[in-house]
From Swiss-Prot:
One of its GO terms (cellular component) is receptor complex. GO terms for molecular function: protease binding; protein-containing complex binding; signaling receptor activity; tumor necrosis factor binding; tumor necrosis factor receptor activity. One of its GO terms (biological process) is regulation of apoptotic process. SMART domains: DEATH, TNFR. TNFR-Cys repeats lie at residues 43-82, 83-125, 126-166, 167-196. CDD domains: Death_TNFR1 (cd08313), TNFRSF1A (cd10576). PANTHER family: TUMOR NECROSIS FACTOR RECEPTOR SUPERFAMILY MEMBER 1A. Residues 363-448 form the Death domain. The chain crosses the membrane at residues 212-234. Residues 344-354 are annotated as: N-SMase activation domain (NSD). Glycans are attached at residues 54, 151, 201. This is Tumor necrosis factor receptor superfamily member 1A. It is a single-pass type I membrane protein.
Length: 461
């Protein structure tokens, strides 16, 4: 028995066969393919498209933000376009019949709207600060927080489409762009390689020790240098005024120090021995010829004045030596006094043997030195005496109207700043000799030896 033939089914099969036969030509003609449309558009210049019904006509495309309503009816006529409705857009020139729908930022993907949708631009979605876009497909992405790189350092900071690149510290390994402790590493070969102790860590303690020791060594060196300087200043006190003048640019005030074993005081009539031409005269003590000692007896009245005018007549006194009982007779040839003649001493020799102090109570002595030194050589004279340049200029400005008073102030300042055993006429004489001013030295000597000066001035010893 055969299957019954249904007339309706047979008709359907015949129609299907006819459609398959005409598909390559008829269907293609009814619905033009995309390639054919592009070929026809290429026949027109840029910014225009071919009329869908008449290829010889090129119509102007619609601007972005608009869509095509009707094609141009003939060459030279404009295409009819309208602006896209709200929620739709076209981002470029087109001849589409309908605008595209705007996309919406997906909150479930933690997206945020960067800029809203406009007629000529689609909605722009992005991520919040400290987040990056992790794409799940070509168009869909999810916002993920950037890695803070705990237990590591940031190699590359977080960007819009890239997470932070971290470099983990020793004892941690990178897992999912996070630094995980090596204690969580079990049997992962990659993990075990990353958790090996680096060789460079062995030298780190040495580097840190050097960083600590270097400042300590510098500090101890400075302390040692300071201690040495203090010790030298204590060992050599004469350096203190010079160091003071170098640091402060001024002369240090020097206290008047009496020389060891030397007491200088003004001469008085009671303390000045008298002089006599008698060769047997004893200026200090008179001794009897008996073996026993007797009280000293003055033989002549004492001269009331002793000044530079008497220096050329100065003769050392002669003493009588009386042997004591039981003394060796070889030491004493005669009991009679034997005078010892002495040569006449020069003024310079007397000054060198007995340095004379420049006394401020006697301004005439200072003025004698001021008037004896040429003004053109005065600054050189004071520099050689040891007065600082700053002090010289200060006193010169202070007494600018009177040059003589300025020179007197400089000499007085030198006398006050110089120790007592150094501020002597001997020092002044040596400086003048070094300056080849022996004539000036003689003038000063004559001034000090003059009767007018001797009658009012007593040089201290």
């Amino acid at each position: 028995m055969g299957l019954p033939i249904v007339p309706g089914l047979l008709l359907s099969l015949v129609l299907l066969a006819l459609l398959m036969g005409i598909h390559p030509s008829g269907v293609t003609g009814l619905v033009p393919s995309l390639g054919d449309r592009e070929k026809r558009d290429n026949l027109c210049p840029q910014g225009k498209y071919a009329h869908p019904k008449n290829n010889s006509i090129c119509c102007t495309k619609c601007h972005k933000g608009t869509y095509l309503v009707s094609d141009c009816p003939s060459p030279g006529q404009e295409t009819v376009c309208e602006v896209c409705d709200k929620g739709t857009f076209t981002a470029s020139q087109n001849h589409v019949r309908q605008c595209l729908s705007c996309k919406t930022c997906r909150k479930e993907m933690f997206q945020v709207e960067i800029s809203p949708c406009k007629a000529d631009m689609d909605t722009v979605c992005g991520c919040k600060k400290n987040q990056f876009q992790r794409y799940l497909s070509e168009t869909h992405f999810q916002c993920v927080d950037c890695s803070p790189c705990f237990n590591g350092t940031v190699t590359i900071p977080c960007k819009e489409k890239q997470n932070t690149v971290c470099n983990c510290h020793a004892g941690f390994f990178l897992s999912g762009n996070e630094c995980t402790p090596c204690s969580h590493c079990k049997k992962n070969q990659e993990c075990m390689k990353l958790c090996l102790p680096p060789v460079a860590n062995v030298t780190n303690p040495q580097d840190s020790g050097t960083a600590v020791l270097l400042p300590l060594v510098i500090f101890l060196g400075l302390c040692l240098l300071f201690f040495i300087c203090i010790s030298l200043l204590c060992r050599y006190p004469q350096w203190r005024p010079r160091v003071y003048s170098i640091i402060c640019r001024d002369s240090a005030p020097v206290k008047e120090v009496e020389g060891e074993g030397i007491v200088t005081k003004p001469l008085t009539p009671a303390s000045i021995p008298a002089f006599s031409p008698n060769p047997g005269f004893n200026p200090t003590l008179g001794f009897s010829t008996t073996p026993r000692f007797s009280h000293p007896v003055s033989s002549t009245p004492i001269s009331p004045v002793f000044g530079p005018s008497n220096w050329h007549n100065f003769v050392p006194p002669v003493r009588e030596v009386v042997p004591t009982q039981g003394a060796d007779p070889l030491l004493y040839g005669s009991l009679n006094p034997v005078p010892i003649p002495a040569p006449v001493r020069k003024w310079e020799d007397v000054v060198a043997a007995q340095p004379q102090r420049l006394d401020t109570a006697d301004p005439a002595m200072l003025y004698a030195v001021v008037d004896g030194v040429p003004p053109t050589r005065w600054k050189e004279f004071m520099r050689l005496l040891g007065l600082s340049e700053h002090e010289i200029e200060r006193l010169e400005l202070q007494n600018g109207r009177c040059l003589r008073e300025a020179h007197y102030s400089m000499l007085e300042a030198w006398r006050r700043r110089t120790p007592r055993h150094e501020a002597t006429l001997d020092v002044v004489g040596r400086v003048l000799c070094d300056m080849n001013l022996r004539g000036c030295l003689e003038n000063i000597r004559e001034t000090l030896e003059s009767p007018a000066h001797s009658s009012t001035t007593h040089l201290p010893r």
